[in-house]
């Protein structure tokens, strides 16, 4: 019997970007069995409700009267998916999307081949997919291009490293073991805290190097210090800066 995949997308006041994300999601060669959209601005006649209802697959619209942030939104969507009997939960936000129609099928195949509890695609710059949306540090070296993640010919998996939650695919049993995102973190750092839970669990996970999720570039937040020998994250937006440092201190 084919295992069920529930897609969970969290959105907040970006209906145009959400529409693009859902267009790619519903064009996958392996379609999700159900789509759950958590609307963090779900008061009154939200345009998102109509957008979700018009999708070509089974859907659930969850409108929240309170902005739960990415953390609370994903937690709500994940729990709803689990309650509906999902075997897999595939995550996305409203400002990014899968690179092509084969991403979900590729992630499922990678998880099956390597017996993974969670698998993520590479997260690449939506304006230049050859570059990573967020730099990845390996030792003292920052990797900024997707090609730099492969260290040998034919490599398919980067074990023990995953970007959450952009395109991340979780087994239901994994979420039962490590839990869902912490509502208190709201945004910024919720994915880091959950990544640490995933590491502590000892469950196998990694990044599939044959799949990509496109996301706006976040590299500009990493500012060079000590004449470029190191970098520090410093978001320009004061709200993002607050949650970045508050949550980093907590984690």
Language-model-derived ranges and their functions:
Residues 39-49, 96-97:
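A conserved acidic beta->alpha catalytic loop
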Residues 86-95:
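Short beta-strand-to-loop acidic/aromatic patch adjacent to the donor-nucleotide binding site
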């Amino acid at each position: 019997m084919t295992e069920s995949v529930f897609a969970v997308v969290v959105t907040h006041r970006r209906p145009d970007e959400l529409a693009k994300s859902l267009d790619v999601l519903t064009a996958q060669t392996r379609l999700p069995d159900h789509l759950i959209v958590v609307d963090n601005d779900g008061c009154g006649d939200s345009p998102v409700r109509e957008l979700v209802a018009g999708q070509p697959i089974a859907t659930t619209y969850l409108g929240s009267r309170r902005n739960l942030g990415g953390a609370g939104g994903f937690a709500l969507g994940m729990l709803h998916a689990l309650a509906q009997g999902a075997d897999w939960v595939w995550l996305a936000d409203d400002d990014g999307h899968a690179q092509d129609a084969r991403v979900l099928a590729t992630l499922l195949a990678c998880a099956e081949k390597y017996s993974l509890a969670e698998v993520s695609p590479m997260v690449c710059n939506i304006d230049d997919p050859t570059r990573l949306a967020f730099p990845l540090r390996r030792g003292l070296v920052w990797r900024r291009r997707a090609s730099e993640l492969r260290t040998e010919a034919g490599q398919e998996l980067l074990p023990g490293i995953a970007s959450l939650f952009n395109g991340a695919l979780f087994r239901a049993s994994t979420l039962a073991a490590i839990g869902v995102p912490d509502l208190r973190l709201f945004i910024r750092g919720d994915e880091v805290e959950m990544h640490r839970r995933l590491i502590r669990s000892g469950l196998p996970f990694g990044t599939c190097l044959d799949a990509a999720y496109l996301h706006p570039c976040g590299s500009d937040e990493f500012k060079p210090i000590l004449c470029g020998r190191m970098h520090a994250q410093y978001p320009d937006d004061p709200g993002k800066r607050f949650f970045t440092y508050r949550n980093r201190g907590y984690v």
